Amino acid sequence: MQDNSVNETKNIVEVGIDSSIEESYLAYSMSVIIGRALPDARDGLKPVHRRILYAMHELGLTSKVAYKKSARIVGDVIGKYHPHGDNAVYDALVRMAQDFSMRLELVDGQGNFGSIDGDNAAAMRYTEARMTKASEEILRDIDKDTIDFVPNYDDTLKEPDILPSRLPNLLVNGANGIAVGMATSIPPHRMDEIIDALVHVLENPNAGLDEILEFVKGPDFPTGGIIYGKAGIIEAYKTGRGRVKVRAKVHVEKTKNKEIIVLDEMPFQTNKAKLVEQISDLAREKQIEGISEVRDESDREGIRVVIELKRDAMSEIVLNHLYKLTTMETTFSIILLAIYNKEPKIFTLLELLHLFLNHRKTIIIRRTIFELEKAKARAHILEGYLIALDNIDEIVRLIKTSQSPEAAKNALMERFTLSEIQSKAILEMRLQRLTGLERDKIKEEYQNLLELIDDLNGILKSEDRLNGVVKTELLEVKEQFSSPRRTEIQESYENIDIEDLIANEPMVVSMSYKGYVKRVDLKAYEKQNRGGKGKLSGSTYEDDFIENFFVANTHDILLFITNKGQLYHLKVYKIPEASRIAMGKAIVNLISLAPDEKIMATLSTKDFSDERSLAFFTKNGVVKRTNLSEFESNRSCGIRAIVLDEGDELVSAKVVDKNAKHLLIASHLGIFIKFPLEEVREIGRTTRGVIGIKLNENDFVVGAVVISDDGNKLLSVSENGLGKQTLAEAYRGQSRGGKGVIGMKLTQKTGNLVGVISVDDENLDLMILTASAKMIRVSIKDIRETGRNASGVKLINTADKVMYVNSCPKEEEPENLETSSAQNLFE
């Protein structure tokens, strides 16, 4: 047999069967992949779903009109757009109406549309349907030339190639389907989280997956349940493939003599009736011991499957068997496979977010062009009306003297330089529009159109304006379809929380001028008497020195606030532990600082209670207060804590609790100002603040204290190592923004002020850092109390300049402690 030989008498082309099968199978495969089984990455719909929604749109079945028989909808879909079996189309319609299948239903069904027990829907002649508000948003603006239309199967009608889709349907509702040689399994998600992620990507196009995971916690199934472990979620979002364990949500009820396990939520796509039957069979066959009865008490209020246990049965053991042997625990495979540019592709989460944003930008640009052309056309006609109204007498006379409408039209065009469209509009104008009121309406409409045209042109010319429209519409969708998370996400039950393995102990965390950070056990620093030489707290580079330190427990959350007003989170135990003399690790390896960014304040907290706030103090005397709860979110790039004036920078930040009454600001030249806390009200993160102190020339803020009682004591330290304790009441209160009073008497002997701290608890030690990296620990009670205008006593005998001071918990006196010699102080 010769390939491709033509029998001219019979007009038959002979081909090899192998090549024919190969070509036919490839054509069939692509038809199934592109035209049937996989969703589009932009609107998240398979062709059958898209055709159903478009057919309902053409029938006018909005969410506000009466329901129409499902058979009518299916008939329109089959006859006009989808020449396949009616059962396949009806099944697709039914699924879009099931609240246990869709996170956001696209069809509002009336009648029996099936159940989570696997019951089939009633026949299409009995059920009725219409669109939901969500599907209306998917089709919104379709009549404004926003998408391309293609011929239907018999080339008699047009159907949409894609839908505008204002909402991210692919990620919100997910998708599943089996094609030829490939399959997709995209889980549903919570609308609020996806919208927040889209807005973040819109504002930060280079955002990484770590930032997106702050918004998208994971899948959110319509049936609830619990996802265990985040590793599979992260892997799926990173590569497009992953697996997650999903468990039913249960609770245990106790009666007088036994326990009852109640199943409240199901794993996604689990048949409840089959699960109940499966549990009953396992109990009857003694594969699971301890179950006396299983019954389904579910109703319209929700799912309730009751598993009664025998008297001696332990619920924890029974539950472990149920998870192992039944579909109370399932594995959901995530495959982010979708169609884009007529080709199937596995996407990452970030790619899907970018694709949807690009789709929305394209839709908005096309809609804007459509509205712009429409507005221009209307404005063109109104310009003709205004010309006619300004010359009404002449126009009436010209029309009266014309022999025909055509002649009148030509005369108007020639006399007033009008277009043909304008001339026709004038000739068709009603006489009532010649009244003064109608004239004003025309002028007002024309003016509004000019403003609209200018606005639409602005959207087309400005990327920022376009992004603003996308963001506004996304937030509108979020507000309209916001709902609580249904699926709980927990750490894997196979993993142990790392914090459980780390002792919660006090640590000294130090940071050098060049940004090297470390933590050292507090016990490594022995207490010395006042006037001691100190111990070396860490080695540094020749031109580096330790400039900041603080004491916190290993489980605490550290808040790093930079000179640029950015705030970063970090657990204390994530800072590498080192010896006293070690240099530490560069902070840029732990948090993502900008090249010109420097840590200026570090605070520790155990939680983000809204009963506390953060007070920020800048070098130029600005103070600001923001509720601590606003800083709970954490981003790799940090979050904005304060907006700074040009040339200003942050110098200090403090935690303010409910007992705080005053704030005190101290300057380099020893000037203090104390004012009521209520004079600094709480404001948002992205704001500037108010003036706290008016500074003299060459002066700047070096520290601040939160005061809860006038009996509080303040400890001031100068750069030459002198210090004193003073009662807070010694500083008279003023109004915020004043010039302040002398807080410490400064001389050439004392040097300028380095800092001021609160020392209400005498069971504290003072730790002092010098420029050469020496640290001395002194008991607070050894520093005598003096008036505000005193210079204080010598705290450290060294020629070094004091750089920073802070307090730390008192250490127990070691037994048989000997005084160290000068030679051993640096060992």
UniProtKB/Swiss-Prot annotation:
- E.C. number(s) listed in UniProt: 5.6.2.2
Q: What EC class is this?
A: isomerase
The residues responsible for catalysis, as annotated, are 126 (o-(5'-phospho-dna)-tyrosine intermediate)
**Matches recorded under PROSITE patterns:** TOPO_IIA
Query: A Gene Ontology molecular-function term?
Result: DNA binding
Q: Which CDD domains match?
A: TOP4c
Subcellular location(s): the record lists: Cytoplasm
Q: Which UniProt keywords apply?
A: ATP-binding, Cytoplasm, DNA-binding, Isomerase, Nucleotide-binding, Topoisomerase
Q: Which domain of life is it from?
A: Bacteria
- Taking every annotated instance into account, which residue ranges of this chain make up the domain Topo IIA-type catalytic? 38-501
UniProt main location, coarse? cytoplasm
The record's catalysed reaction(s) read:
ATP-dependent breakage, passage and rejoining of double-stranded DNA
Please, one GO biological process term?
DNA topological change
Tell me where the sequence motif GyrA-box sits in this chain: 528-534
Q: What else is known?
A: Few gyrases are as efficient as E.coli at forming negative supercoils. Not all organisms have 2 type II topoisomerases; in organisms with a single type II topoisomerase this enzyme also has to decatenate newly replicated chromosomes.
**What is annotated about its quaternary structure and interactions?**
Heterotetramer, composed of two GyrA and two GyrB chains. In the heterotetramer, GyrA contains the active site tyrosine that forms a transient covalent intermediate with DNA, while GyrB binds cofactors and catalyzes ATP hydrolysis.
What this chain does, per the record?
A: A type II topoisomerase that negatively supercoils closed circular double-stranded (ds) DNA in an ATP-dependent manner to modulate DNA topology and maintain chromosomes in an underwound state. Negative supercoiling favors strand separation, and DNA replication, transcription, recombination and repair, all of which involve strand separation. Also able to catalyze the interconversion of other topological isomers of dsDNA rings, including catenanes and knotted rings. Type II topoisomerases break and join 2 DNA strands simultaneously in an ATP-dependent manner.
Q: Which family does it belong to?
A: Belongs to the type II topoisomerase GyrA/ParC subunit family.
| Name of the protein this chain belongs to | DNA gyrase subunit A
User: What organism is recorded for this protein?
Assistant: Helicobacter pylori (strain ATCC 700392 / 26695)
**What gene name does this entry carry?**
gyrA
